[in-house]
C-alpha cells in the first residue's frame, strides 16, 4: 500500500471510530478524549522507539519498571522532554482496557506521572498541563464509573486498532496528519467555533509559502494567535525542517487550544527544544518580545474582536503600537495584531496575515494605521480570497503580506 493510500484509509477509519465512540455526546465536546488518546499512543511509541534505538533485541514494553535506573530516566527526559515507564505505555494499558475496573484512575495517574516527569527539566513548560483537558471523571464519558470506563476503553481500543505501521518507518507524519484531519473535521462539524482554532489546509499552505517566499532559510517562525498550530506546521510541511533553524513559536489565549497546539507539535515529531507555545493574551501580555526578531510570521487572528485599546492609556506608548500614532479601535483589534506582528519581524522578515476586509476601507484610526503602513513601505501585497473557505463563516477574507 502506498503511503498516500495508507493515510487516506487511516483518516477514513479514524473519523468512523471517533463518531462511534462518542455515542450521543456532541463531537465537539468529546474531541479532547479522542485527540488526547491519539497523542498518548504517539508519545508512547515515540518514546519506545527512542529507548530501543533500533535494537530488535530490546522490547521496552515488556521490561519491568524496576530495571529503569535514575541515570536512564534522567538521560531520556533530557532528550525527549518526558519519561514513560514500560507499565505506563499505551500498548500495555490498551491490552486490558476492557477489563480494567480502575481504567479512569489509572489513566489519570499515568498522565499526571508523564507531566510530572518533566518537572525541573528544560521541557517542563512544554509538558506541563498537556493532559489537563482529558478529564477521566467527566460526565461526558458517562454517569457512573463503569460507564466512564466503558467509554474510555472504547476510545483506547479504537485508537489501538489504527494501523500506523512501524513507528520508525513512518515517513509522512501519519500521526500528525491523523491529528490534523480530526481537528479539521471537528472544526467543520462545529461551525463557527471551529474557525477559532483551525485554519483550513489550503489556506495555511498559501500563507506559509507567502511568508517564506524567496528565503533559503529562516531563523524561526511565529504565530501570535496560533490556535492549534496548523499554520506553523504548514511551514514545516512546505519546507525542509532544516530551513527553519531555531524552531516554531506561538501564543494562544484559549487554554484548551493551547494544549492542542503543543500536542500538535509533538505529533509532528518536533522535539520540545524546537518549539515554544505560550499561553496568554498576545496584545496585552506578549511573549518573545525580548528575543531575536522573527524572519517569518504567519497568522489568522480572530476577526474584529474587542480589546482594551484606548481604555489603557499605556498602550499608545507600547513599542508595537506607538509608531503608528494611534491604536486600533476597541471594537476591532485587527490592526493591533498586524502592528504586533510588524514589530516582531526581523529586518529581512515577512509576515502573511489573514485579515477581515473591513480594515482596508474603514475610516478613523484604521485609516491612519493604513497610511502608516503604506508610507513606511511595509506592505508588499494584499491578496483577496474567495468566500466560504473558512469554517463557520462565508465572508471573503484577505491576506496582508
Q: PLM features: residue spans?
A:
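Non-catalytic, mostly N-terminal accessory regions of nucleic-acid modification and defense proteins
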Residues: 1-206, 210-211, 215, 273-282, ...
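A structure-centric signal for secondary-structure junctions around beta-strands
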Residues: 34, 175, 218, 245, ...
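Extracellular loop and loop/strand-boundary signature of outer-membrane beta-barrel proteins
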Residues: 104, 325-327
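Conserved S-adenosyl-L-methionine
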Residues: 193-299, 304-306, 311-315, 320-324, ...
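Tryptophan-centered motif/residue detector
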Residues: 15, 28, 258, 307-308, ...
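Conserved Class I SAM-dependent methyltransferase catalytic core
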Residues: 13, 20, 29-42, 327-401
Amino acid at each position: 500500500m502506498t503511503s498516500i493510500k495508507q493515510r487516506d484509509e487511516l483518516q477514513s477509519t479514524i473519523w468512523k471510530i471517533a463518531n462511534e465512540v462518542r455515542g450521543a455526546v456532541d463531537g465537539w465536546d468529546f474531541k479532547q478524549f479522542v485527540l488526547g488518546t491519539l497523542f498518548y499512543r504517539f508519545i508512547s511509541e515515540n518514546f519506545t522507539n527512542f529507548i530501543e534505538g533500533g535494537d530488535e533485541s530490546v522490547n521496552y514494553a515488556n521490561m519491568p519498571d524496576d530495571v529503569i535506573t535514575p541515570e536512564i530516566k534522567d538521560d531520556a527526559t533530557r532528550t525527549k522532554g518526558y519519561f514513560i515507564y514500560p507499565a505506563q505505555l499505551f500498548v500495555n494499558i490498551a491490552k486490558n482496557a476492557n477489563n480494567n475496573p480502575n481504567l479512569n484512575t489509572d489513566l489519570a495517574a499515568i498522565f499526571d506521572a508523564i507531566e510530572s516527569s518533566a518537572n525541573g527539566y528544560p521541557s517542563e513548560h512544554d509538558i506541563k498541563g498537556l493532559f489537563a483537558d482529558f478529564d477521566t471523571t467527566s460526565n461526558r464519558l458517562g454517569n457512573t464509573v463503569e460507564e466512564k470506563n466503558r467509554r474510555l476503553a472504547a476510545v483506547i481500543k479504537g485508537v489501538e486498532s489504527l494501523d500506523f505501521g512501524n513507528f520508525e518507518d513512518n515517513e509522512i507524519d501519519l500521526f500528525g496528519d491523523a491529528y490534523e484531519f480530526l481537528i479539521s473535521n471537528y472544526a467543520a462539524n462545529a461551525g463557527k467555533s471551529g474557525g477559532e482554532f483551525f485554519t483550513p489546509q489550503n489556506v495555511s499552505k498559501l500563507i506559509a509559502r507567502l511568508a517564506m517566499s524567496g528565503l533559503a532559510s529562516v531563523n524561526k517562525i511565529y504565530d501570535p494567535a496560533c490556535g492549534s498550530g496548523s499554520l506553523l506546521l504548514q511551514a514545516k510541511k512546505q519546507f525542509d525542517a532544516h530551513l527553519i533553524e531555531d524552531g516554531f513559536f506561538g501564543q494562544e489565549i484559549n487554554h484548551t487550544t493551547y494544549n492542542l497546539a503543543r500536542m500538535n507539535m509533538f505529533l509532528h515529531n518536533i522535539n520540545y527544544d524546537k518549539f515554544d507555545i505560550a499561553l496568554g493574551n498576545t496584545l496585552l501580555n506578549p511573549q518573545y518580545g525580548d528575543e531575536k526578531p522573527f524572519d517569518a510570521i504567519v497568522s489568522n487572528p480572530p476577526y474584529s474582536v474587542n480589546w482594551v485599546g484606548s481604555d489603557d492609556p499605556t498602550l499608545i506608548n507600547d513599542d508595537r503600537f506607538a509608531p503608528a500614532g494611534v491604536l486600533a479601535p476597541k471594537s476591532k483589534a485587527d490592526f493591533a495584531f498586524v502592528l504586533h506582528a510588524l514589530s516582531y519581524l526581523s529586518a529581512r522578515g515577512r509576515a502573511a496575515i489573514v485579515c477581515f476586509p473591513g480594515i482596508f476601507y474603514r475610516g478613523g484610526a484604521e485609516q491612519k494605521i493604513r497610511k502608516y503602513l503604506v508610507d513606511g513601505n511595509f506592505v508588499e501585497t494584499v491578496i483577496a480570497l474567495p468566500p466560504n473557505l473558512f469554517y463557520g463563516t462565508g465572508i471573503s477574507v484577505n491576506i496582508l503580506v
